[in-house]
Amino acid sequence: MRQTRGEASPSAVSLAFKFASLAVLCVLLLLMVILGYSNSSTKAKEVTVTTNGQLRDEKESLKLKNDSPDLLIKHLQTKQNMGDKTVYLTFDDGPSAVTTRLLDVLKSADVKATFFMLSPRMNEFKQAVKRAEKEGHALGLHGVTHNNRLFYQTPTSPLKEMQEARDTLQDITGYKTDLVRTPYGSKPSLTASQIRNLEKDGFVYWDWTIDSMDWKYRNSQYVTAVLQQLENMEHSSSSRPNVILMHDLPATVNALPVLINKLKEKGYSFGVLEDTMVPVHE
């Protein structure tokens, strides 16, 4: 039958329909590819490098910080490589008249350390505190009195001393820290109720795994003590971090270059304590 003008043939209609369907299908496939790429991008983990060279998953860490303490500890234990050759130099009871010289030694050796400081001494040596913060050292708190009886006197006395020290540090530097070390170490004096009060306010308390005994020797003999304890930990295949206790003392500063050089010769690197690590309690 002859078609009249203006009427489309069945074959033309069918062909147009097929082209339209194909175009819609292509658009849908393109949208699926774009959406799939977008989802994979948003799901990509945000990873940063911490000051001790370890990788930290920011989103996972933030989520776990709001989760239960047990899950957080489990997470940190898997994230923290505690068996590597990293040492953490920590200095208590400062700042003091020799802290500036101590910072000179660390700067010359390109080493960062962690300082647990007392509130009255921070007020006395403000410039040393500011310099330590500016040069990238980790700043922690050691309380106020450094008196065993007063510090551990009540369930809230450690908390109050750390809060005062935290306020002092923040007034001087604008920096707020949660890292604390209690005088003479947490054991056996720090009670369960005192621990709960500290942790409730966000404080993370640290002890040490290596006591340099610089407070006892007051000379370079502490270097030998540190190296011997490190060797013992290596032989025991310990998975604990090498956290070295020292103090802002003249003899400690005098022998510090020797200690740092010997540690470097043995292949150790240096890190600072931070809130992504599992604290040690001796």
From Swiss-Prot:
<dbReference type="GO" id="GO:0005975">
    <property type="term" value="P:carbohydrate metabolic process"/>
</dbReference>
<comment type="similarity">
    <text>Belongs to the polysaccharide deacetylase family.</text>
</comment>
<feature type="domain" description="NodB homology">
    <location>
        <begin position="85"/>
        <end position="271"/>
    </location>
</feature>
<keyword id="KW-0812">Transmembrane</keyword>
<protein>
    <recommendedName>
        <fullName>Putative polysaccharide deacetylase YheN</fullName>
        <ecNumber>3.-.-.-</ecNumber>
    </recommendedName>
</protein>
<feature type="transmembrane region" description="Helical">
    <location>
        <begin position="15"/>
        <end position="35"/>
    </location>
</feature>
<dbReference type="GO" id="GO:0005886">
    <property type="term" value="C:plasma membrane"/>
</dbReference>
<dbReference type="Pfam" id="PF01522">
    <property type="entry name" value="Polysacc_deac_1"/>
</dbReference>
<keyword id="KW-0378">Hydrolase</keyword>
<dbReference type="InterPro" id="IPR050248">
    <property type="entry name" value="Polysacc_deacetylase_ArnD"/>
</dbReference>
<keyword id="KW-0472">Membrane</keyword>
<keyword id="KW-1133">Transmembrane helix</keyword>
<keyword id="KW-1003">Cell membrane</keyword>
<dbReference type="InterPro" id="IPR002509">
    <property type="entry name" value="NODB_dom"/>
</dbReference>
<dbReference type="GO" id="GO:0016810">
    <property type="term" value="F:hydrolase activity, acting on carbon-nitrogen (but not peptide) bonds"/>
</dbReference>
<dbReference type="InterPro" id="IPR011330">
    <property type="entry name" value="Glyco_hydro/deAcase_b/a-brl"/>
</dbReference>
